[in-house]
Amino acid sequence: MEQYQAYLELRRSRYQDILYPLFFRESIYGLAYAHESFFIENVDYNNKFSLLIVKRLSTRMYQQTHFILFVNDSKKNTFVGYNYHFFSQIILEGFGIVVEILFSLQLFSSSLRGLEIVKSYKNFQSIHSIFPFFEDQLIYLNHKSDIRIPYPIHLEILVQILRYSIKDVSFFHLIRLFFYYYYNWNSLFPPKKWIFTFFSKRNRRIFLFLYNLYVWEYESIFLFLRNKSSQLQLKHFRVFFERIFFYEKIKHLVEVSTKNCSYTFFFFKDTFIHYVRYQGKSILVLKNTPFLINKWKYYFIYLWQCHFDIWAGLETIYINELSQYSFHFLGYFLSIPLNLSVVRSQMLQNSFLIKIVIKKLDTIVPIIPLMRSLAKTKFCNVMGHPISKPVWANLSDFDIIDRFLRICRNFSHYYNGSAKKKSFYQIKYILRFSCIKTLARKHKSTVRIYLKKLSSEKLLEEFFTEEDLFSLIFPRTSFTLRRFYRGRIWYLDILLRNDFVNYL
């Protein structure tokens, strides 16, 4: 227990005066100048949430002698003669900016030490980096746990988590004051999903910060338990650490193996745990016995209930065998089928038939959900037949073709890593004919007449390569095309999901 407390203390910072940058101009501009987003794009927010406006309003509040907040009657709340709701929203957004700057600077200074690590981290920012990792590791594992991360139903839990890192009493008094205004803090059971609607519509930046802080705290404890469950403890933990620090781990492995045992592979017989988080959910993939997997399940439940005071039932975590289970992940449909191969072995006068089971990760384009998303965006009907986009009919021909090509190109880059290309080409076919029907609608003509006037081959080449066309028409004609049909190309410069995936 003492080792666990010491571990958490090392990961937590101690900011004594969090309000200081808001009241003293010299400090806030230094922080704003040094602040850059190294990991994700900055969250968009309105220009009215500028630091200069926040500082001026904070100065007015600081100079105000009579400032009374009526908890039960928010209409009486005024701020320097103006509406309290507008100014409290701006100041609360300013708090989110300042705290985000401080924590991002701490994260950069503690996690990325040296230029080489920064370059390595940026090389694995792509959302597609997880799929080659799955291809390398997932086939050797046997169980998968779907974890739905519970969210605190009361704001006090989030504030208590924030108090672990910040020791500024005035900051918590003021942030509680704003929360009192938006909602009755004393209510024991707030409405369902109230926290999400409160933050996502009014204070998106402070919501993302508090949520990420809560997840960071939960994953820090999980990392501690994960390292303690393995005999070969990790020296570093970053995104895709298996690849970034591969050579350093090999050196460390050799040192450990020569001192403690005679067999190097002894360490690889221990627990294999891989963790991925996305969209408020997480995937825990293990190579373990059912007993140890259920043990991890109760670890998570007790962690949420005892440490965060959040109720989490057994239905929060589902455990499945990978060989008998398929799942959706980031717009792909993943499965690990068992391919049975029979090998004949000849030994002198006897021959033997040996059955070998080979696992392979299949990344399939979910054709039906994608057609539904295309139908919602008016590219096709419910049956999957292409239709025109009347909203774009008033644009020029160049703009119409450019928009469709951009959508088709983004779709191709995102789904080029699919194992089977037929569904992939069907979606591109829908986009192509939707473009042709939109152009024909604009020129008040039919598709056949419009294609006769326009060079159809040129438009066809814009949407498909030569291999695409042959694979769509003759999917299994030659060995070369069959190799292309099965090939996968992962684009490692994609930071966001495809737009169609948002509708899945």
Swiss-Prot record:
Record keywords, A-Z: Chloroplast, mRNA processing, Plastid, RNA-binding, tRNA processing
* A GO MF term: RNA binding
- The question of whether Lyase is a record keyword is answered with no
Question: Among the record's GO biological process terms, what is one?
Answer: RNA splicing
Subcellular localization is given as: Plastid, Chloroplast
Q: What is its main location?
A: plastid
* Record-level GO cellular component terms: chloroplast
- According to its UniProt entry, what is the function of this protein? Usually encoded in the trnK tRNA gene intron. Probably assists in splicing its own and other chloroplast group II introns.
Protein family membership: Belongs to the intron maturase 2 family. MatK subfamily.
Question: What is the recorded name of this protein?
Answer: Maturase K
The protein's organism comes out as Vigna unguiculata
